[in-house]
Structure formats: C-alpha cells, structure tokens
Amino acid sequence: MTTVTLIGTRLADTGREFVYQGESPDCEGCPYRSQCLNLSEGTRYRVTGIRENAQTLDCAVHDAGVRAVEVEPAPVPANVLSKQAYAGGRVSLAGPCPHTECPSHGYCVPDGADFDDERVIDQVLGEPPHDVCALDRDLTLVEFRAEDG
C-alpha cells in the first residue's frame, strides 16, 4: 500500500530504503506534523516515487527541508537459523550479535526487525555473506515479508 509522506530532501531518492524512527522532539509545533508522522515506527519503507512539482518545506529536523514522496513497506533481508529457513515460515531472529565487524552483522541485527518479533519469510536468498559465524550459528539469508505499515 502506497503512502504519501514527507522526508528529508537528501533522502528523497526512488529506491532508497529507511526505517521510520518516529517523532523527534523538534517536530513539536510543526505545521507539517500530520504529513511527516503518518508512518509506523520501526517499519522499513522504500521510496517508490517522488512527487513532482512539490515544494521543499522548511524543517527543524532536516537541514535541507522536506519534500513529498510515495513510500511502501519494504521487505527486510535477515539471517535466520538454517533449520528454520523456508518460505512462508514464521521465525524470529537468532539473537543479538556483538561482532559488528562481520559482513553479516547487518543481516543478523537488521534495521526494521526486532529480536522478539516473529516474521514471515517471503523468500530464501541463500548463503549469508560471512564465511564462518563467530557465534557458531548455522545461518541462511532470507527476506522477511514487508509488514503493513
């Protein structure tokens, strides 16, 4: 489902993905609050279109202002335990990982998915980018279904 919202002009690129973090204290009193704060906190979104002929509006959060874009909830790539990795299955993430230097860290601790949430696997992507898991986990890279924002 496409939603029209306002985001920072520096972020307004078709295809860009972001996780909506919610309201900033600087949003208080802004006349555009209802257009900016209309997404679901913690949900990953993809910009699918940029509204043409829309003006750039001043913003206390974004230094270059905000502009109107169309967004849709986006799938979340993530590593899950291999024994649970099948399309259509409901799984949770394997758990926290302190190894931030690992090429898979962004998939083991993905933006837009929480450890205590069960998510539906949309598709199995295959091997994760790391050679060996430092926590000795047998992992598979999957894509979680986009959540309805």
From Swiss-Prot:
Source superkingdom: Archaea
HAMAP family: UPF0179
Protein name, per record: UPF0179 protein Hlac_2319
Family classification: Belongs to the UPF0179 family.
Listed Pfam families: UPF0179
InterPro entries according to UniProt: UPF0179
